[in-house]
Amino acid sequence: MSNSAVSSADSIKLTEYSHGAGCGCKISPKVLTTILASQLPVFTDPNLLVGNQSRDDAAVYKLNDEIGIISTTDFFMPIVDDPFTFGRIAATNAISDIYAMGGTPMMAIAILGWPVNKLPAEIAQQVVDGGRQACMEAGIMLAGGHSIDAPEPIFGLAVTGQIALTDLKQNDTAKAGDRLYLTKPIGIGILTTAQKQKKLKDEDSQIAVNAMCQLNSIGAKIAKITGVNALTDVTGFGLAGHLLEVCQGAKLTAKLDLDSVPLLPRALDYLAQGCIPGGTHRNYDSYGEHLPALTDHQKAILCDPQTSGGLLVAVSSEAEAELVALLNAHQIEPICIGSLETPTSTANVVLC
Protein backbone atom coordinates (compact mmCIF):
# COMPACT_ATOMS: atom_id res chain seq x y z
CA MET A 1 0.00 0.00 0.00
CA SER A 2 1.28 3.45 -0.86
CA ASN A 3 2.12 6.16 1.66
CA SER A 4 -1.20 7.79 0.79
CA ALA A 5 -3.08 4.83 2.18
CA VAL A 6 -5.00 5.34 5.35
CA SER A 7 -3.43 3.35 8.17
CA SER A 8 -5.97 3.79 10.94
CA ALA A 9 -9.30 2.06 10.42
CA ASP A 10 -10.90 4.27 13.05
CA SER A 11 -10.13 7.41 11.06
CA ILE A 12 -11.64 6.17 7.80
CA LYS A 13 -14.87 7.70 6.59
CA LEU A 14 -15.93 5.70 3.56
CA THR A 15 -18.29 8.36 2.21
CA GLU A 16 -15.30 10.65 1.68
CA TYR A 17 -13.93 8.22 -0.90
CA SER A 18 -16.93 8.28 -3.25
CA HIS A 19 -18.65 10.94 -5.32
CA GLY A 20 -22.08 9.35 -4.86
CA ALA A 21 -23.90 7.40 -2.19
CA GLY A 22 -26.04 4.27 -2.28
CA CYS A 23 -28.79 4.09 -4.86
CA GLY A 24 -28.29 7.82 -5.43
CA CYS A 25 -25.38 6.65 -7.62
CA LYS A 26 -27.84 5.26 -10.15
CA ILE A 27 -27.63 6.57 -13.69
CA SER A 28 -30.73 8.70 -14.31
CA PRO A 29 -33.70 7.07 -16.07
CA LYS A 30 -33.29 9.37 -19.08
CA VAL A 31 -29.62 8.49 -19.60
CA LEU A 32 -30.34 4.82 -18.93
CA THR A 33 -32.89 4.81 -21.74
CA THR A 34 -30.17 5.91 -24.17
CA ILE A 35 -27.73 3.28 -22.89
CA LEU A 36 -30.24 0.45 -23.25
CA ALA A 37 -31.34 1.42 -26.77
CA SER A 38 -29.45 -1.45 -28.42
CA GLN A 39 -28.66 -1.38 -32.14
CA LEU A 40 -28.49 -5.17 -32.27
CA PRO A 41 -31.31 -7.44 -33.50
CA VAL A 42 -33.78 -8.42 -30.79
CA PHE A 43 -33.13 -11.88 -29.37
CA THR A 44 -36.03 -13.60 -27.65
CA ASP A 45 -36.42 -16.65 -25.45
CA PRO A 46 -39.92 -17.89 -24.61
CA ASN A 47 -38.72 -19.03 -21.20
CA LEU A 48 -37.58 -15.53 -20.21
CA LEU A 49 -40.75 -14.44 -18.47
CA VAL A 50 -39.47 -11.08 -17.23
CA GLY A 51 -36.64 -9.26 -18.99
CA ASN A 52 -35.74 -5.61 -19.33
CA GLN A 53 -38.76 -4.41 -21.29
CA SER A 54 -40.66 -3.20 -18.22
CA ARG A 55 -37.55 -2.35 -16.19
CA ASP A 56 -38.71 -4.69 -13.49
CA ASP A 57 -36.69 -5.42 -10.37
CA ALA A 58 -35.17 -8.69 -11.62
CA ALA A 59 -35.15 -11.12 -14.52
CA VAL A 60 -37.24 -14.28 -14.25
CA TYR A 61 -36.54 -17.45 -16.24
CA LYS A 62 -39.05 -20.29 -16.46
CA LEU A 63 -37.37 -23.47 -15.22
CA ASN A 64 -40.45 -25.67 -15.60
CA ASP A 65 -44.21 -25.26 -15.48
CA GLU A 66 -44.13 -24.51 -11.76
CA ILE A 67 -40.82 -22.84 -10.85
CA GLY A 68 -38.94 -19.80 -12.11
CA ILE A 69 -35.39 -18.67 -11.40
CA ILE A 70 -34.92 -15.01 -10.43
CA SER A 71 -31.65 -13.23 -11.22
CA THR A 72 -30.63 -9.73 -10.18
CA THR A 73 -27.64 -7.59 -9.31
CA ASP A 74 -27.19 -4.34 -7.42
CA PHE A 75 -24.11 -2.50 -6.18
CA PHE A 76 -23.12 1.02 -5.24
CA MET A 77 -20.67 3.32 -3.46
CA PRO A 78 -20.69 3.89 0.32
CA ILE A 79 -23.78 5.49 1.80
CA VAL A 80 -22.45 5.31 5.38
CA ASP A 81 -18.95 5.58 6.84
CA ASP A 82 -18.89 2.32 8.79
CA PRO A 83 -17.62 -0.47 6.48
CA PHE A 84 -19.59 -3.33 8.05
CA THR A 85 -22.81 -1.33 7.89
CA PHE A 86 -22.11 -0.33 4.28
CA GLY A 87 -21.73 -3.97 3.31
CA ARG A 88 -24.87 -4.95 5.16
CA ILE A 89 -26.95 -2.20 3.53
CA ALA A 90 -25.63 -2.93 0.04
CA ALA A 91 -26.42 -6.63 0.40
CA THR A 92 -29.86 -6.01 1.90
CA ASN A 93 -30.65 -3.70 -1.01
CA ALA A 94 -29.56 -6.28 -3.59
CA ILE A 95 -31.54 -9.11 -2.00
CA SER A 96 -34.64 -6.90 -1.99
CA ASP A 97 -35.12 -7.33 -5.73
CA ILE A 98 -35.82 -11.03 -5.20
CA TYR A 99 -38.52 -10.25 -2.65
CA ALA A 100 -39.95 -7.54 -4.90
CA MET A 101 -40.74 -10.22 -7.49
CA GLY A 102 -42.44 -12.33 -4.82
CA GLY A 103 -39.60 -14.83 -4.62
CA THR A 104 -37.17 -16.19 -2.07
CA PRO A 105 -33.37 -15.85 -2.36
CA MET A 106 -31.18 -18.94 -2.84
CA MET A 107 -27.58 -17.66 -2.93
CA ALA A 108 -25.51 -14.57 -3.62
CA ILE A 109 -22.22 -13.64 -5.28
CA ALA A 110 -20.29 -10.59 -4.06
CA ILE A 111 -19.22 -7.70 -6.31
CA LEU A 112 -16.35 -5.63 -4.90
CA GLY A 113 -14.45 -2.67 -6.30
CA TRP A 114 -11.71 -1.40 -4.00
CA PRO A 115 -9.07 1.38 -4.18
CA VAL A 116 -6.28 -0.87 -2.91
CA ASN A 117 -3.72 1.95 -2.83
CA LYS A 118 -5.96 4.19 -0.73
CA LEU A 119 -7.84 1.92 1.67
CA PRO A 120 -6.63 -1.10 3.66
CA ALA A 121 -7.77 -4.57 2.68
CA GLU A 122 -8.93 -5.05 6.28
CA ILE A 123 -11.62 -2.43 5.67
CA ALA A 124 -12.79 -4.30 2.58
CA GLN A 125 -12.98 -7.43 4.73
CA GLN A 126 -15.40 -5.64 7.05
CA VAL A 127 -17.52 -4.57 4.07
CA VAL A 128 -17.74 -8.15 2.83
CA ASP A 129 -18.55 -9.36 6.35
CA GLY A 130 -21.42 -6.88 6.45
CA GLY A 131 -22.69 -8.38 3.21
CA ARG A 132 -22.30 -11.85 4.65
CA GLN A 133 -24.34 -10.81 7.70
CA ALA A 134 -27.23 -9.66 5.50
CA CYS A 135 -27.08 -12.93 3.57
CA MET A 136 -27.22 -14.89 6.81
CA GLU A 137 -30.29 -12.90 7.88
CA ALA A 138 -31.90 -13.80 4.55
CA GLY A 139 -30.99 -17.46 5.06
CA ILE A 140 -28.59 -17.72 2.12
CA MET A 141 -24.89 -18.25 1.50
CA LEU A 142 -22.50 -15.68 0.13
CA ALA A 143 -21.18 -18.26 -2.27
CA GLY A 144 -18.34 -16.39 -4.00
CA GLY A 145 -17.67 -13.19 -5.84
CA HIS A 146 -15.39 -11.05 -7.97
CA SER A 147 -13.21 -8.06 -7.11
CA ILE A 148 -11.33 -5.36 -9.02
CA ASP A 149 -8.99 -2.50 -8.16
CA ALA A 150 -11.24 0.55 -8.55
CA PRO A 151 -10.85 4.31 -7.92
CA GLU A 152 -13.77 4.30 -5.45
CA PRO A 153 -15.19 1.68 -3.07
CA ILE A 154 -18.05 -0.30 -4.60
CA PHE A 155 -19.92 -3.23 -3.12
CA GLY A 156 -23.03 -5.23 -3.90
CA LEU A 157 -24.35 -8.64 -4.82
CA ALA A 158 -25.59 -10.72 -7.70
CA VAL A 159 -28.46 -12.72 -6.22
CA THR A 160 -30.26 -15.83 -7.44
CA GLY A 161 -33.73 -16.69 -6.20
CA GLN A 162 -36.67 -18.88 -6.99
CA ILE A 163 -40.39 -18.30 -7.36
CA ALA A 164 -43.51 -20.39 -7.72
CA LEU A 165 -44.83 -19.05 -11.01
CA THR A 166 -48.30 -18.70 -9.52
CA ASP A 167 -46.82 -16.18 -7.04
CA LEU A 168 -44.83 -14.12 -9.55
CA LYS A 169 -45.49 -10.39 -9.20
CA GLN A 170 -44.37 -7.72 -11.66
CA ASN A 171 -44.30 -3.94 -11.75
CA ASP A 172 -46.49 -3.53 -14.85
CA THR A 173 -49.54 -5.65 -14.00
CA ALA A 174 -51.55 -3.31 -11.77
CA LYS A 175 -55.28 -2.82 -12.38
CA ALA A 176 -57.60 0.16 -12.21
CA GLY A 177 -59.07 0.44 -8.74
CA ASP A 178 -56.01 -0.98 -7.00
CA ARG A 179 -54.98 0.60 -3.73
CA LEU A 180 -51.32 1.58 -3.21
CA TYR A 181 -49.42 0.62 -0.06
CA LEU A 182 -45.84 1.44 0.97
CA THR A 183 -43.98 -0.68 3.54
CA LYS A 184 -41.14 1.70 4.52
CA PRO A 185 -40.99 5.46 5.06
CA ILE A 186 -39.39 7.83 2.54
CA GLY A 187 -36.43 10.08 3.36
CA ILE A 188 -33.32 7.91 3.24
CA GLY A 189 -31.68 10.15 0.64
CA ILE A 190 -32.34 13.22 2.76
CA LEU A 191 -30.85 11.75 5.94
CA THR A 192 -27.80 10.24 4.25
CA THR A 193 -27.15 13.56 2.53
CA ALA A 194 -27.31 15.22 5.94
CA GLN A 195 -24.57 12.83 7.03
CA LYS A 196 -22.45 13.61 3.99
CA GLN A 197 -22.89 17.34 4.68
CA LYS A 198 -21.92 16.72 8.33
CA LYS A 199 -25.28 18.04 9.54
CA LEU A 200 -26.62 14.76 10.92
CA LYS A 201 -26.93 14.75 14.70
CA ASP A 202 -25.51 11.77 16.59
CA GLU A 203 -28.92 10.86 17.97
CA ASP A 204 -30.30 10.63 14.42
CA SER A 205 -27.47 8.52 12.99
CA GLN A 206 -29.34 5.20 13.17
CA ILE A 207 -32.69 6.32 11.74
CA ALA A 208 -31.84 5.70 8.09
CA VAL A 209 -29.46 2.82 8.89
CA ASN A 210 -32.17 0.84 10.66
CA ALA A 211 -34.53 1.31 7.72
CA MET A 212 -31.91 0.33 5.14
CA CYS A 213 -30.92 -2.82 7.05
CA GLN A 214 -34.50 -4.10 7.19
CA LEU A 215 -34.99 -6.96 4.74
CA ASN A 216 -38.05 -6.82 2.49
CA SER A 217 -38.70 -10.51 3.12
CA ILE A 218 -42.39 -9.74 3.62
CA GLY A 219 -42.56 -9.55 -0.19
CA ALA A 220 -42.59 -13.35 -0.50
CA LYS A 221 -45.69 -13.46 1.72
CA ILE A 222 -47.38 -10.48 0.05
CA ALA A 223 -47.02 -12.25 -3.31
CA LYS A 224 -49.19 -15.14 -2.12
CA ILE A 225 -52.19 -12.80 -1.81
CA THR A 226 -54.17 -13.33 -5.00
CA GLY A 227 -55.44 -9.76 -5.13
CA VAL A 228 -51.97 -8.23 -5.11
CA ASN A 229 -51.69 -7.25 -8.76
CA ALA A 230 -48.30 -5.51 -8.84
CA LEU A 231 -45.24 -5.27 -6.63
CA THR A 232 -41.94 -3.37 -6.82
CA ASP A 233 -39.38 -1.87 -4.48
CA VAL A 234 -38.68 1.83 -4.13
CA THR A 235 -34.99 2.58 -4.64
CA GLY A 236 -32.84 5.04 -6.55
CA PHE A 237 -35.51 6.54 -8.81
CA GLY A 238 -37.55 7.62 -5.80
CA LEU A 239 -41.20 6.97 -5.00
CA ALA A 240 -42.38 8.96 -8.02
CA GLY A 241 -40.03 7.18 -10.42
CA HIS A 242 -40.99 3.67 -9.39
CA LEU A 243 -44.67 4.60 -9.20
CA LEU A 244 -44.40 5.91 -12.76
CA GLU A 245 -43.04 2.53 -13.88
CA VAL A 246 -46.13 0.90 -12.35
CA CYS A 247 -48.46 3.41 -14.02
CA GLN A 248 -46.85 3.42 -17.44
CA GLY A 249 -46.54 -0.36 -17.54
CA ALA A 250 -50.25 -0.82 -16.84
CA LYS A 251 -51.41 2.36 -18.66
CA LEU A 252 -52.94 3.80 -15.49
CA THR A 253 -52.85 7.02 -13.48
CA ALA A 254 -51.91 7.10 -9.81
CA LYS A 255 -53.97 9.28 -7.51
CA LEU A 256 -51.43 9.98 -4.78
CA ASP A 257 -52.20 11.34 -1.32
CA LEU A 258 -48.91 13.06 -0.55
CA ASP A 259 -49.91 13.74 3.05
CA SER A 260 -50.22 9.98 3.61
CA VAL A 261 -46.72 9.17 2.34
CA PRO A 262 -44.77 8.07 5.44
CA LEU A 263 -41.52 9.91 6.18
CA LEU A 264 -38.58 8.91 8.34
CA PRO A 265 -38.32 10.79 11.63
CA ARG A 266 -36.43 14.09 11.27
CA ALA A 267 -36.49 13.91 7.46
CA LEU A 268 -38.40 17.18 7.20
CA ASP A 269 -35.99 18.90 9.60
CA TYR A 270 -32.98 18.00 7.45
CA LEU A 271 -34.87 18.83 4.27
CA ALA A 272 -35.39 22.33 5.67
CA GLN A 273 -31.60 22.54 6.09
CA GLY A 274 -31.08 21.91 2.38
CA CYS A 275 -30.10 18.24 2.60
CA ILE A 276 -31.24 17.26 -0.89
CA PRO A 277 -29.19 14.62 -2.75
CA GLY A 278 -28.11 15.21 -6.33
CA GLY A 279 -30.12 12.16 -7.35
CA THR A 280 -33.32 14.01 -6.48
CA HIS A 281 -32.67 16.61 -9.19
CA ARG A 282 -31.58 13.97 -11.72
CA ASN A 283 -34.74 12.01 -11.04
CA TYR A 284 -37.02 14.99 -11.54
CA ASP A 285 -35.19 16.03 -14.71
CA SER A 286 -35.75 12.53 -16.08
CA TYR A 287 -39.45 12.07 -15.42
CA GLY A 288 -40.86 15.38 -14.13
CA GLU A 289 -42.86 15.86 -17.34
CA HIS A 290 -45.09 12.96 -16.26
CA LEU A 291 -45.84 14.52 -12.88
CA PRO A 292 -48.21 17.33 -11.93
CA ALA A 293 -46.87 20.75 -10.99
CA LEU A 294 -44.89 20.26 -7.77
CA THR A 295 -43.41 22.59 -5.20
CA ASP A 296 -39.72 22.19 -4.38
CA HIS A 297 -40.78 20.55 -1.12
CA GLN A 298 -42.94 18.00 -2.92
CA LYS A 299 -40.18 17.26 -5.44
CA ALA A 300 -37.71 16.66 -2.62
CA ILE A 301 -39.98 14.00 -1.12
CA LEU A 302 -41.31 12.27 -4.23
CA CYS A 303 -37.97 12.18 -6.08
CA ASP A 304 -35.77 11.41 -3.06
CA PRO A 305 -33.59 8.40 -4.02
CA GLN A 306 -34.06 5.53 -1.61
CA THR A 307 -31.46 2.91 -0.79
CA SER A 308 -32.93 -0.41 0.35
CA GLY A 309 -36.34 1.25 0.37
CA GLY A 310 -39.69 -0.39 0.97
CA LEU A 311 -42.10 -2.27 -1.22
CA LEU A 312 -44.79 -0.53 -3.26
CA VAL A 313 -47.86 -2.76 -3.44
CA ALA A 314 -50.87 -2.46 -5.75
CA VAL A 315 -53.73 -4.48 -4.26
CA SER A 316 -57.37 -4.87 -5.22
CA SER A 317 -59.97 -3.46 -2.83
CA GLU A 318 -61.26 -7.01 -2.29
CA ALA A 319 -57.86 -8.20 -1.03
CA GLU A 320 -56.93 -5.01 0.84
CA ALA A 321 -58.02 -6.33 4.24
CA GLU A 322 -55.89 -9.45 3.78
CA LEU A 323 -52.83 -7.33 2.98
CA VAL A 324 -53.43 -5.06 5.98
CA ALA A 325 -53.75 -8.08 8.28
CA LEU A 326 -50.50 -9.55 6.94
CA LEU A 327 -48.58 -6.31 7.42
CA ASN A 328 -49.94 -5.87 10.93
CA ALA A 329 -48.96 -9.44 11.81
CA HIS A 330 -45.36 -8.63 10.85
CA GLN A 331 -45.23 -5.29 12.70
CA ILE A 332 -45.30 -3.27 9.48
CA GLU A 333 -47.63 -0.30 9.62
CA PRO A 334 -50.08 -0.62 6.70
CA ILE A 335 -50.14 2.78 5.00
CA CYS A 336 -52.28 3.43 1.95
CA ILE A 337 -50.82 6.28 -0.09
CA GLY A 338 -53.28 6.36 -2.97
CA SER A 339 -54.97 4.40 -5.72
CA LEU A 340 -54.79 3.63 -9.42
CA GLU A 341 -57.41 4.64 -11.95
CA THR A 342 -58.07 4.80 -15.66
CA PRO A 343 -56.21 7.81 -17.11
CA THR A 344 -58.19 11.03 -17.49
CA SER A 345 -55.24 13.30 -18.31
CA THR A 346 -51.72 13.11 -19.71
CA ALA A 347 -50.16 13.04 -16.22
CA ASN A 348 -49.32 9.58 -14.89
CA VAL A 349 -49.46 10.81 -11.30
CA VAL A 350 -51.94 13.28 -9.83
CA LEU A 351 -52.08 14.58 -6.28
CA CYS A 352 -55.25 14.49 -4.23
From Swiss-Prot:
ATP binds at K26, S54, R55, D56, D74, D97, G145, H146, S147. The record marks K26 as: Important for catalytic activity. The keyword Ribosomal protein does not apply. Binds 1 Mg(2+) ion per monomer. Its EC number is 2.7.9.3. One of its GO terms (cellular component) is cytoplasm. Keywords: ATP-binding, Kinase, Magnesium, Metal-binding, Nucleotide-binding, Selenium, Transferase. It is an enzyme of class 2 (transferase). Mg(2+) binds at D57, D97, D233. InterPro entries: PurM-like_C_dom, PurM-like_C_sf, PurM-like_N, PurM-like_N_sf, SelD_I, SPS/SelD. Belongs to the selenophosphate synthase 1 family. Class I subfamily. This is Selenide, water dikinase. It comes from Shewanella sp. (strain MR-7). The lineage of its organism: Bacteria, Pseudomonadati, Pseudomonadota, Gammaproteobacteria, Alteromonadales.
